Structure formats: C-alpha cells, structure tokens
Amino acid sequence: MQTNLLKPKTINVEQLGANRAKVTLEPFERGYGHTLGNALRRVLLSSMVGHAATEVTIAGVLHEYSSIDGVQEDVVNILLNLKGVVFKLHNRDEVTLSLRKDGEGPITAADIQTPHDVEIVNPDHVIMNLSHGGKIDMQIKVENGRGYVPGNVRRYGDESPKSIGRIVLDASFSPVKRVSYTVESARVEQRTDLDKLVLEIETNGAVTAEDAVRASAKILVEQLAVFAQLEGNELGAIINDPAPRSSQQFDPILLRPVDELELTVRSANCLKAENIYYIGDLIQRTENELLKTPNLGRKSLNEIKEVLASRGLTLGMRLESWPPAGLDKR
C-alpha cells in the first residue's frame, strides 16, 4: 500500500493585474488544501515584512486634530492619505524623510524627498492639496515591521511617545492587501479524491504575489522545523516555564480595532457598549454572551461571525495573557 503523501507537482501563476495574481498548486492529499491554504493565508496577512510611515512631525501642528492654513485637508485626512504611500527601504531599517512644498496644487508622494536607497512605489498618490499661499513642512519617519501595529502599543525606549508635535501613527506594514483561497478537486490517474489549492493574492506593489507566497512558505517551514527537533527535556522546559505576560506575542490581527471589521453601525455600537474595542476582545466572547448584549440580535451575530470567518477567526477562542501590556482600553 502506498503510504507516502503526495506533493504538488504542478504550480501555475496567473497574473490578474498589476498587483494581483492567482497561484494554483496540485495535487494535495485530501484535506491538505484547506490545511495549507488557511495557514498560508494567515501568514500572508499577518507576518510579511514591509515598510510604513510610523511618525510624523508637521511645522506649526501640535496634534492630529488640527488644521493647517492654506491646506484643504485637515491633519487627520493628511495622515490617512500618508498611510496610503507605499515605501521600500533598501539596506536600512528606518529613515526620516522630508516633505516641503509651497504654492497652489496637489502634493503627491513624488514630492517626498528620498535618498537613493528609499523607493516610493506609488509616486502619484495624492497626500494633500494646497490652496493659494499654502505651504507644508513635515518630517516622516518610515520603519520596517510585520503586520499591523497600533501606535499606542509600540515601544520607544527612553523617548516619550507624548512629545509635543510628534504624531505617532498606527502602522500597517504588511505589503499584502488581500488573500483568498479555494480548494477544488484534482485527479491523478485513477485517484479523484485529491485537492487543488488556488490562492488569489493582492499586494500593494512593494512585492509581487509570487514573492509573497515564497516568503510566507519560508516562514511556515522555519516555524514548523522546530517541532521536528523537539526533545523531551526541551519540551518539558517550555511547558514548565511559560513566557511571561510582557513577552507574549499576539497575532497583529487581534490588535486591530473592531471598527476595521466594517460592521454595521448597530453592531459596532453594541460591541463598544460591552467594552469590546479590539478583535482580540471580540473573539473571546461566545455566541450566548453576545446574544445577551442589549440590541444585538441574531442577524447582527451572524454578521459578526461571517466577518470573523473571512479572517480565519471564530467566536469562543481563548487567548493567554490578554490584553497585552500597554494596549489602550479606552
């Protein structure tokens, strides 16, 4: 009897657009399409290294709820637009860039002054618009990182995060914008119970979809290799000496506000009334607990379950040492 597991022999990459691609792998043993597809999707969304603006200083601006004379957008909208700029740093981990311009007209990412080893992938992206007599002078700190990191949980050593005029941004480092996967039937000779995995990936242009899949697969291999090397004593040490609360690492998805789930206003307000501000708070609630929430009915519950399922999450999950130290519970 054949006991060796099948490995994919056919890999096909189909370009669906400038930053979108469909990657097809087959054949897999039955069930392995979902096993590997979900794992790759989670890694692609949460663990890819990328670059993002993390801090901004604007001349004459003390906080983000300000407006600037001669600039059509307020500071909040400027920061939102700035988050849409895609950076690539070569041979460095962080950089501080300058943006200085005056005169009427739009300001795009191309107006940011960059050294030779910093690349802006979408130079036509509009950051703000100046009116007659308007001018802007700002400093932008760009760092590398993984996933999504809220500004209020990042650490700054001895430097105070409350420095006047220094605006700390929530940073979405991941170059992967969307990932979905489907599992179809595959056939090898007389066997018809095999899986074909189809991954559809969209990136921000900083990496190609193929490179993203390679990088995510490498991360999985490196993580799983540890299990193949486990020894009894080492495993016991891990069990008897759990990581302290301060060093516990959480999936960056769990640190995102529930507002990013794009729920209806009714559902979102019900969650906030129950002090559920982050996705990590939400997934620890059970269906029965949520149904006891005033004004949250079965329709809203189904909406929440569907949105979580699209991100590979469910209700009733348990997280050790939640919430992480420094998380703003508002």
Curated annotation (Swiss-Prot):
Please name the SMART domains in this protein's record. RPOLD
Please state the span of the N-terminal signal peptide per the UniProt entry: none
Specify whether Transcription is a keyword of the entry: yes
Enzyme class of the recorded protein, top EC level: transferase
Domain of life of the organism in this record? Bacteria
Q: Which reaction does it catalyse?
A: RNA(n) + a ribonucleoside 5'-triphosphate = RNA(n+1) + diphosphate
Alphabetically list the UniProt keywords. Answer: DNA-directed RNA polymerase, Nucleotidyltransferase, Transcription, Transferase
* Stretch list, region Alpha N-terminal domain (alpha-NTD): 1-231
A GO molecular-function annotation: DNA binding
Q: What Gene3D superfamilies does its record include? A: 5' to 3' exonuclease, C-terminal subdomain (1.10.150.20), DNA-directed RNA polymerase, insert domain (2.170.120.12), RNA polymerase, RBP11-like subunit (3.30.1360.10)
A Pfam match is: RNA_pol_L
Instruction: Give yes or no: UniProt keyword Nucleotidyltransferase.
Output: yes
Q: Report disulfide bridges, numbered on this chain.
A: none
Which Enzyme Commission number(s) are on file for it? 2.7.7.6
Q: Which family does it belong to?
A: Belongs to the RNA polymerase alpha chain family.
Q: What does this protein do?
A: DNA-dependent RNA polymerase catalyzes the transcription of DNA into RNA using the four ribonucleoside triphosphates as substrates.
Q: What is known of its domains?
A: The N-terminal domain is essential for RNAP assembly and basal transcription, whereas the C-terminal domain is involved in interaction with transcriptional regulators and with upstream promoter elements.
Classification via HAMAP family: RNApol_bact_RpoA (MF_00059)
- What this protein is called in its record is DNA-directed RNA polymerase subunit alpha
Q: What is the lineage of its organism?
A: Bacteria, Pseudomonadati, Pseudomonadota, Betaproteobacteria, Burkholderiales
Q: Which gene encodes it?
A: rpoA
